[in-house]
A protein has these predicted regions:
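Compositionally biased, intrinsically disordered or flexible polar/acidic segments
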Residues: 20-191
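Extracellular calcium-associated, cysteine-rich motifs in secreted modular proteins
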Residues: 674-700
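Recognizes extended acidic, P/S/T-rich segments that occur
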Residues: 229-267, 279-287
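Acidic Gly/Asp/Thr-rich repetitive segments characteristic of extracellular carbohydrate-active
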Residues: 298-343
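Right-handed parallel beta-helix
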Residues: 363, 368, 388-399, 414-425, ...
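Extracellular beta-rich repeat passengers
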Residues: 491, 502-674
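Extracellular beta-strand-rich solenoid/capping regions of secreted or surface-exposed proteins
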Residues: 211, 331-339, 350-367, 375-393, ...
């Protein structure tokens, strides 16, 4: 064994409290994926694929991973995704065709070190063999890997401690025998098998649910423990170092695995730790977890994106010109890697984008209401919001005929909210939120998607005036107005999870839809609340009698079902086809693709809470028409007209190609209230330099 004289393996002893350094945590990631999708928070991502050996250097330690053959990245996609989000243990590195993996550490300081290895098979093949663990060619243990465990606490681990005789000595840890998937490792940490796991609220949850500051902490106890010591406070270092003598932080010893706290505030981050005590009195120190109680992003924010953090506490960044890119532009403000920010505007007018603008940074607020004049209008290319914890308010997109683009989107977003936006004259579709989670789209006006506008993926003359394809887990879509769009009002794009099961949970309530052509709400998702929506036929409407048409297309496994309640359908003449009292009215489903319906498609109660005030359809109709679209700093002529046409059941133009009432094919088909075709004037106004001289976001 050379200089290695101490080995400890999972299940043979309690954890040691290590003071060795450095502490290194590595997550072997799936290749070709965004780090936010596959990397466990607080771990260093490492993608190893297509090579037999790869080096990295972390905190002065050289780490090499090598295989008996070519290494490849692999994953269990469904485990990485919702609802498990097991990003640490549901991907990893393995040898193509099976074989040994060796980790070699160089430049470690002399003394005792520990290594924790995660061994969870991800490829779906049941592994019957145990994995032999060697240290410097000496077999120390055999560990049976788990197969597609869906949490870190459930995954198999190996834990060893070893002595290093000097800084020039390398230590090799070899995993041998059969199929080995190495998900990640942790150097110089306690034994996870003896620690509490599965914290709730989850570690780093900055949207923790609470009732007036009260919430319950809970965890999964380690095996064979009899007591738990709870530490709780607002100083991470104090919680980490605390002992039972620290009365301000130590909350006592208990047998249960939950602890109630009160008096918390969203303005504070909280830290807690649970030490496990076994029957012999051995204490295993726990990790320090943190959370922050959820806080409503702004007054009126509702639904699953209501607690988006946005740029709170970060920098204030001003947009000072209407350029596509460069200093002072919206693009630079969105994409610069400067951390949390609130984007405000010293300029108003029209920004003509030369290409798609993707706002991919986390913790960003875009405050369109701070612009002078008529606010900010974007044309020619779309703007999308893919970061997490984004708050976007009072923005306007009027795309126009040209390249095949959409308008706005929350695709892939997390804990984000888009509020009081206006989107029109798009060619692909106005809005999309596929792959997002914890989202809200509210009080947004989607109108006049260009219909026969030479979409690049379709034959000439094909209509594609579509409002939105929505997905999410969970996505809230409420108090929006969809007017003069031929179809996809909404298209439900729940998609499939990594196992091929129907996915997506959507909360669709209190929306107003007016003057569609042949498609209302269709498509499908796993669970949908569809409540209190108001559908009003117009002069272009050819599909009568429906608000929701569920399509079971045989593309996946599992089920798609709907809670359908209090939805109104008003015919073009003003009579009610469905007055909201009969929940069998206005809905249907269709089967295709060999789909066998072996479940009940209509649920008798909501699938999940809405975290919003849900109105009746009639009340929502009045509410939406009085408060929708980019109303700040001012509602423009276009939106004023569309709202009035919805209210009065009218239209003011026909498409120049398709000839359909209220359904444009070019933006020049449209005249505003001042009889101007296409874009109305959006004058450029610039605030004086002394408007906010200290750049704190508050006018002087």
């Amino acid at each position: 064994m050379g200089c290695l004289n101490s080995i400890r393996v999972l299940g043979l002893s309690a954890a040691l409290a290590f003071a060795a350094s450095p502490v290194i945590k590595v997550d072997f990631d799936m290749s070709g994926r965004n780090s936010s999708e596959v990397t466990e928070p607080n771990y260093v991502p490492w993608v190893v694929s297509g090579v037999s050996s790869k080096d990295t250097s972390l905190s002065g330690v050289k780490v090499n991973v090598s295989g008996s053959g070519n290494l490849k990245a692999n994953w269990y996609k469904a485990g990485v995704q919702s609802p498990s989000y097991a990003r640490l243990v549901c991907d990893g590195v393995m040898v193509e065709g099976g074989g040994a993996i060796t980790l070699t550490f160089s430049n470690l300081a002399a003394g005792t070190h520990s290594l924790l290895l995660y061994l969870n098979n991800v490829d779906g093949t049941a592994v019957s063999n145990s994995i032999d663990v060697y240290v410097n060619n000496s077999k120390q243990a055999s560990v049976k890997p788990t197969n597609r465990a869906l949490s870190t606490g459930e995954a198999a681990i190996a834990y060893v401690t070893f002595n290093v005789g000097g800084t020039g000595i390398s230590t090799a840890i070899k995993l041998n025998t059969g199929t080995v998937t190495l998900n990640g490792f942790e150097l110089n940490v306690p034994n996870a098998a003896a620690q509490a796991t599965g914290p709730s609220p989850a570690d780093l949850d900055y949207h923790a649910p609470h009732e007036s500051g009260a919430l319950t902490l809970s965890w999964t106890a380690a095996k064979s423990v009899v007591k738990h010591r709870v530490y709780f406070g607002t100083d991470s270092a104090a919680v980490l170092a605390a002992t039972p003598s620290n009365t301000a932080v130590y909350k006592g010893e208990q047998s249960g695995s939950s602890y109630k706290v009160s008096g918390t505030t969203p303005l504070q981050t909280y830290y807690w730790r649970v030490d496990e005590v076994d029957a012999n009195g051995t204490v295993s120190a726990g990790n320090v977890w943190s959370f922050k109680p959820g806080r409503v992003a702004f007054e009126g924010a509702e639904g699953y994106g209501r607690n988006a953090v946005g740029g709170r506490g970060g920098k204030v960044v001003y947009v000072t010109n209407l350029n596509d890119d460069g200093a002072g532009s919206l693009r630079e403000a969105c994409t610069a890697e400067i951390g949390p920010r609130t984007i405000m505007f010293k300029v108003s007018g029209m920004i003509q984008l030369k290409s798609r603008l993707v706002c991919n940074q986390d913790y960003v607020t875009i405050a369109g209401q701070t612009a002078p004049g008529k606010g900010i209008t974007i044309k020619s290319a779309p703007i999308g919001f893919t970061g997490k914890d984004m708050v976007i308010r009072f923005m306007r997109v009027r795309l126009g005929y040209g390249a095949t683009y959409d308008g706005m989107g929350l695709t892939g977003g997390d804990h984000s909210i888009l509020d009081h936006a206006s989107i029109s004259w798009t060619i692909d579709e106005a809005f999309s939120s596929r792959g997002g989670k914890n989202l809200t789209l509210q009080r947004t006006l989607i109108s006049e998607a260009l219909n026969i506008a030479d979409h690049q993926n379709y034959a000439a003359g094909t209509g594609h005036g579509y409002a939105a394809t929505i997905g999410g887990d969970i996505g809230s879509f409420h108090h929006n107005l969809l007017a003069h769009n031929a179809g996809r009002n909404w298209s439900l794009g729940g998609g499939l999870d990594g196992n091929g099961y129907y996915a997506g949970r959507l909360d669709i309530f209190n929306n107003v839809v007016y003057n569609w052509v042949s498609r209302v709400t269709d498509g499908g998702a796993h669970e949908v609340n569809f409540v209190g929506n108001y559908y009003k036929e117009g002069a272009a409407t050819t599909l009568h009698g429906y608000t929701l048409r569920a399509q079971f297309e045989g593309t996946g496994k599992g089920s798609q079902a709907y809670y359908y309640h209090n939805n109104i359908l008003e015919a073009a003449g003003g009579k009610f086809t469905c007055d909201g009292t009969n929940d069998n009215c206005g809905r249907e489903y269709s089967l295709s693709g060999g789909q066998v319906l072996d479940w009940e498609p209509w649920n008798s109660k909501p699938f999940f809470a809405s975290y919003a005030t849900v109105q009746s359809a009639k009340a929502a109709y009045k509410d939406v028409l009085s408060d929708v679209g980019q109303r700040m700093p001012v509602l423009d002529n276009h939106d004023t007209r569309v709202i009035n046409e919805t209210k009065n059941g009218t239209y003011s133009m026909k498409g120049s190609v398709g000839g359909m009432a209220g359904i444009p094919d070019r933006e020049t088909d449209v005249k505003d209230t001042a009889n101007i075709k296409g874009w109305e004037p959006y004058p450029s106004e610039i605030r004086a330099d002394d408007y906010d001289s200290d750049l704190d976001g508050l006018p002087d």
